[in-house]
Amino acid sequence: MVSAAAGWAAPAFAVAAVVIWVVLCGELLRRRRRGAGSGKGDAAAAARLPPGSFGWPVVGETLEFVSCAYSPRPEAFVDKRRKLHGSAVFRSHLFGSATVVTADAEVSRFVLQSDARAFVPWYPRSLTELMGKSSILLINGALQRRVHGLVGAFFKSSHLKSQLTADMRRRLSPALSSFPDSSLLHVQHLAKSVVFEILVRGLIGLEAGEEMQQLKQQFQEFIVGLMSLPIKLPGTRLYRSLQAKKKMARLIQRIIREKRARRAAASLPRDAIDMLIGDGSDELTDELISDNMIDLMIPAEDSVPVLITLAVKFLSECPLALHQLEEENIQLKRRKTDMGETLQWTDYMSLSFTQHVITETLRLGNIIGGIMRKAVRDVEVKGHLIPKGWCVFVYFRSVHLDDTLYDEPYKFNPWRWKEKDMSNGSFTPFGGGQRLCPGLDLARLEASIFLHHLVTSFRWVAEEDHIVNFPTVRLKRGMPIRVTAKEDDD
């Protein structure tokens, strides 16, 4: 973990950025503390508001939130207020908006399960600029359900899982064999390289080559703008990211046009674009499809590689878990070799302890710390009023690290999932409701395949590395491990 000193020194730059952000965002000035109420102003409504404070004028409690986010324990912001107010649901003022923060599993589940008649997505302005109005993250109602359903169905398809499994095996085997004994393998870097190209092929059908490399470079330029200041002047971070997105969109829309021109009516979808254009809806325009293909590339750059990297870190720190995972995977490999069969995606997903390791990594790592929604009407839940126009911050991290829900929550313990129920609302690493991440099965599969090939190919000694939690979760050094190849009879 990052030292406490480093965790609290780093926010100096972030604090400056946040101050500029809040000053520049017009919405901040429109939502002063007194103007952020329910709009009714009556004593009864005020009494039902969650306990809490709006903090400082204009900036609210944003600066302390960001400072905690950079520390080894980002949940300290929420934990402090839970104790102070005696409630896991409290009010605050974050990123320019009056906000209800919930670390209550029941309230969080209610918000996630609610539809656009109660809550709609809310994101920082720079992110909404980059995502575009057609993004699955921002659209609502029937169109959102249609896009989510089509993409989710394709991601769950045996065709895509079989293709992804073969592609990962084809990429991982030579990549891992290129590391000689005692060399350093940076897990995060390798995972990003492998996962991105494979997922892009599944999304838009693009094969490895010059265009893939150009797309990868443009995507790198695009993604760093997601948490930038909302200034679109030439030369700014947001402007450069928007220009990169335009270049990606031109490539993807060309692919869409080519696919529409040659598409046979009865052909099976080979990628996500095929699935969407096959729906035949006039609402699924080329712009909407390209926007969503770009959005769906984000897990390949961010969440899936980080999931893999965190799993390796946690396993390296828990030799007993690493040994059990090795044994499970080696036994599967031997059994399939003796049968003369190639591992299929169902084989990887059948590895029960490997799945427990991935689940525990998701809980402890909290790759997605939480989500924000905006109330479109007054909403009441568990006696708390969330006024119309307020944001609600569903903070997954505090729920996943709640000692009333998990014994020794800061301990990596994959065995806890042998008996634990994942459907009770206290485990939500992929969100929930109509906006449940459509790629959750693929994320598990990719992590399972990577871990299988790693533990059956190498022994390793991990070098020291630290988790950085803000603005996104990552390993500071990319998780370097010093590898030694295993013999076939190991």
Curated annotation (Swiss-Prot):
Any GO molecular function: heme binding
Primary residence: membrane
EC supergroup of this enzyme: oxidoreductase
Keywords for this protein: Heme, Iron, Membrane, Metal-binding, Monooxygenase, Oxidoreductase, Transmembrane, Transmembrane helix
Transmembrane portions of the chain: 4-24
Keyword Metal-binding: yes
InterPro entries cross-referenced by the UniProt entry: Cyt_P450, Cyt_P450_CS, Cyt_P450_E_grp-I, Cyt_P450_sf
Catalytic activity: 6-deoxoteasterone + reduced [NADPH--hemoprotein reductase] + O2 = 3-dehydro-6-deoxoteasterone + oxidized [NADPH--hemoprotein reductase] + 2 H2O + H(+)
Binding annotation for heme: 437
Membrane topology: Single-pass membrane protein
Annotated CDD domains: CYP90-like
Cofactor dependency: heme
Family according to the record: Belongs to the cytochrome P450 family.
The protein's name: Cytochrome P450 90D2
